[in-house]
Curated annotation (Swiss-Prot):
Name of this protein: ATP-dependent Clp protease proteolytic subunit
GO cellular component: cytoplasm; endopeptidase Clp complex
Function (record text): Cleaves peptides in various proteins in a process that requires ATP hydrolysis. Has a chymotrypsin-like activity. Plays a major role in the degradation of misfolded proteins.
Source lineage: Bacteria, Pseudomonadati, Pseudomonadota, Alphaproteobacteria, Hyphomicrobiales
EC numbers, comma separated: 3.4.21.92
Record keyword Iron-sulfur present: no
Subcellular location: Cytoplasm
Similarity comment: Belongs to the peptidase S14 family.
Species, as recorded: Azorhizobium caulinodans (strain ATCC 43989 / DSM 5975 / JCM 20966 / LMG 6465 / NBRC 14845 / NCIMB 13405 / ORS 571)
GO BP annotation list: protein quality control for misfolded or incompletely synthesized proteins
Length: 210
């Protein structure tokens, strides 16, 4: 009987086979796309996903520090500190990182989308982008609750500053936009400055690898 975990993973992650001068070589689809300098950020932003994304960014920088990296984002958001680890690495490495929203980029997903290289931040026409302030909960002694509240306020301030930096919007407009869940179409996100371009087709002169 086949292992149900193996069946599940094989169903979700297709394998591709390439012919090389040494014979056939099989890759899972994401490893093959990584060869083309494409990184996928899909699902909730948490420590495991963040670690993989950071590792891929660092690997691609070491492989070629001058060649652009493409990041495809479809994420509902997640843990702020995990997202900031990816954000800081995107800013730290030498290659330009282009970002493309497919599906959705919500919460920390939207921050990573707008953190791409200026002029290289894209969304497909039916993508949805959502921004809001950080949220969290804590129970315990009053002093501990106050400390955690101060930390969330500090994170809120820092996230607002990042959005200001990448969108060019004044802090007052960012604070107002992030006060509640703020859903945007791709065109609205472009007007707001979260992305640079809404694209519906790959340019005919652009190779299909990126």
């Amino acid at each position: 009987m086949r292992d149900p975990v193996d069946t599940y993973m094989n169903y979700l992650v297709p394998m591709v086979v390439e012919q090389t001068n040494r014979g056939e070589r099989a890759y899972d689809i994401y490893s093959r796309l990584l060869k083309e300098r494409i990184i996928f950020l899909t699902g909730p932003v948490e420590d495991g996903m963040s670690t993989l994304a950071v590792a891929q960014l660092l690997f691609l920088e070491a492989e070629n520090p001058k060649k652009e990296i493409s990041m495809y984002i479809n994420s509902p958001g997640g843990v702020v500190t995990s997202g900031l680890a990816i954000y800081d690495t995107m800013q730290f490495i030498r290659p330009a990182v282009s970002t493309l929203c497919i599906g959705q980029a919500a919460s920390m997903g939207s921050l990573l989308l707008t953190a791409g290289e200026k002029g290289l931040r894209f969304a497909l026409p039916n993508a949805r982008i959502m921004v809001h302030q950080p949220s969290g909960g804590f129970q315990g002694q009053v002093t501990d609750i106050m400390l955690h509240a101060q930390e969330i306020l500090s994170l809120k301030k820092r996230l607002n500053e990042i959005y200001v930096k990448h969108t060019g919007q004044p802090i007052e407009k960012i604070e107002d936009a992030l006060e509640r869940d703020n859903f945007m179409t791709a065109n609205a996100a472009q007007e707001f400055g979260l992305i640079d371009t809404v694209i519906d087709k790959r340019p005919s002169d652009e190779p299909a690898k990126a």
